[in-house]
């Protein structure tokens, strides 16, 4: 019985790529810098302390993958452990370092075109664009119109938004148009309708995602994002391995978390909502138990990126990794004879790096299963090697990009 599980530790890069110079990311290393901070005692909080402790991931080859990628073996991990998984690192062929590019490339479809961006840090959006959105949504105006951290913009503009009913429009270095609105005073349904309008009006701008950022709370310092985020993505520009599995093999692709949004629903047969790493883990375990032949369980653990990477929270990132590692054996225990488990990422987001944006890094490619031989997979020239490997595993037609490691 053919079953695979992909767990994406969103933003968990393991060392800068050769082209990081083009992104201002030379020297970035999400995993490496977290490990260094932990070893120096700079990542202690109420949830964790001391050196980074990831024995299960390390046993599968994560430490070795980081070393092959960056030349640095993460402090706190045992360099002499017996490796039981196949491990490697992959560079990104896509032009960007964003979520859709990384995920689409994982599924065999690299983004070889340039996304549209709103590059101006202030007055970021064209007036003709925002005028059309406001007219269709029957809104008097909007706030923001800038590059901003999602948490900072709530403190700066959240109270004014609640008083005026004007949505907060903002962007970042990624190809995104983000809209933040209060769930109670503005309404979640109204926010989602507004985002759909924005998605339609952005068609000519080639913007990767419109992101709904609902929040709650009474005032500054007390606002919190909710779990009702929605990503309205463009559709992948070519057929992904997910679609081939469904169309050619009658298979099932189970999306957990924001996976379905990232692929605009393409190739997804079941969508499971869960918020937070514990809930995402529980949902993953339940779907693995239910999964049948020719199925793919695909989970994105977004909090590594959104709650810790972008917020430059090293201690929180380390604690989340250790939680993930502690629960990983629960997944391993569910693997059947022919199952393949792939642990990977979609880009980097080094919490020690300047700014709040993603970092251009190699991603780990950790593969295990009862029939997967242990050892190094070496450097993979594209994330699409994962998609090509899945195409070979399921017996679909080949992907245009990538080489199988199975």
Curated annotation (Swiss-Prot):
Binding of Mn(2+) 2, residues: 305, 310, 358
What Enzyme Commission number(s) does the record list for this chain?
Answer: 5.4.2.7
Single GO MF annotation: manganese ion binding
Please give the GO cellular component terms listed in this UniProt entry.
cytosol
The record, for Pfam families, names: Metalloenzyme
The catalysed reaction is:
2-deoxy-alpha-D-ribose 1-phosphate = 2-deoxy-D-ribose 5-phosphate; alpha-D-ribose 1-phosphate = D-ribose 5-phosphate
Q: Which principal EC class is assigned to this enzyme?
A: isomerase
Q: In which pathway does it act?
A: Carbohydrate degradation; 2-deoxy-D-ribose 1-phosphate degradation; D-glyceraldehyde 3-phosphate and acetaldehyde from 2-deoxy-alpha-D-ribose 1-phosphate: step 1/2
Principal subcellular localization: cytoplasm
Intracellular or extracellular location(s): Cytoplasm
Query: Which BP terms in the Gene Ontology apply to this protein?
Result: 2-deoxyribose 1-phosphate catabolic process; 5-phosphoribose 1-diphosphate biosynthetic process; metabolic compound salvage; nucleotide metabolic process
| InterPro entries for the chain | Alkaline_phosphatase_core_sf, DeoB, Metalloenzyme, Phosphopentomutase_DeoB_cap_sf
- Which keywords does this chain's UniProt record carry? Cytoplasm, Isomerase, Manganese, Metal-binding
Report the function annotation for this chain: Isomerase that catalyzes the conversion of deoxy-ribose 1-phosphate (dRib-1-P) and ribose 1-phosphate (Rib-1-P) to deoxy-ribose 5-phosphate (dRib-5-P) and ribose 5-phosphate (Rib-5-P), respectively.
Give the family from UniProt: Belongs to the phosphopentomutase family.
Name of the protein described by the UniProt record: Phosphopentomutase
Give the originating organism: Photobacterium profundum (strain SS9)
